[in-house]
């Protein structure tokens, strides 16, 4: 809760500010197209001719990176912007474009991906469709249900995603047939990174050097953990030459020092996966002529209070409803959000979401919250001001939060303050990343999620995965996420309907039902919606923003110039 004060102290360290630079908000996401957008400029068509290449560009990030090799989540997200090329990218209008591969489909069931001309691995070997197939098979062998169903130790079955595939004679195209049509399949490919078959095949382990063979415009030159730097240089095998010769990622332990470095010109931009500049820093940065801000309409959910619907206090829907009316959303929006922040709907997903429905706004209503507490059996308050049931037990729960995410801790503290003032006791469980994952994720808990409630931030990519609308975080059967532990048949039936959609109109119908379900049952709460505010040095021009990876995207390095 000290973030506002800390951010304001940065003012004393700034040089005298003149004015803020900004950009107009991007439009909302459009429905995905089965073909590449014809009227949207590609990065190649849009890139200017720079007066001279940029020798070195430094990106600040607070991402925790330990090994800098393929398979480390935070590194993979970072490297997706430089070396680990996804199949496609999504622009800020919500439209998809080829990156590593072009794509096509006739029926939303069989999707064909064709490797772009001239694409090679950094060791000189060509990228082929067999690399895509190998990656899917490798993931299958490591727990993903790509071509065969997977059964967990507890008997939970994840059905296979694909029913089959074909590869073209020239090995450059693969056609993947889904178990059921998915008009939104491209959203899953914005973060799908391909592995080199010739490196990994037949090996249980690979060396760090082998793990760093990639197919993007850059290759990893060095990782200095002590200095906190990750350096990428141009991949000479890439078919096009970017404007930036070298990209250095500077790892920071906290946001305060990172933003100060941006103001002082020590770094050129800041980046966090699917997250913009926190509202507590935006006023400070907006007043600095050395910093430019760009506002991007976002499809993520930056601040989520998720309930465990299967264990603990919040198996009782009345208590989830009570919390939904007891919270002060205007306080979250004002304190943590930007000037574009909004109070969310009870339907959870923001208006940029494909299939969005305008459900009722979340409101603060103590009398309604009190009615729901009484319906749950908590009719009186004790001497400490907390609701108690007939057995004299206080309404209390433990709220789990990742200690490494300062803003998330701020959300948790504000929830505790507000709910305890209302009459629900909140015990904060502030833990490290590993302990947090073990309590909040099916994958890392081995299908034994123990949190009663937790603070999450859902990425735009995650919100769109599976059936979309954040459903992977709600579905208790999801192999990786499933934090809300919802196994309700009504919910499952809606997911089946969405999965079976053969047209975008069919999908919209199912999406509307899912938002109505969220609004009626409150398995989770969005504390506020917001655009993403991205920050970079005012010395840069012609920056390109990606809907998934923000400023840290491959196309940016081909467009960005120095003023």
Placement of each model-derived feature along the sequence:
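N-terminal lobe/hinge region of extracytoplasmic solute-binding protein
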Residues: 60-107, 137, 213
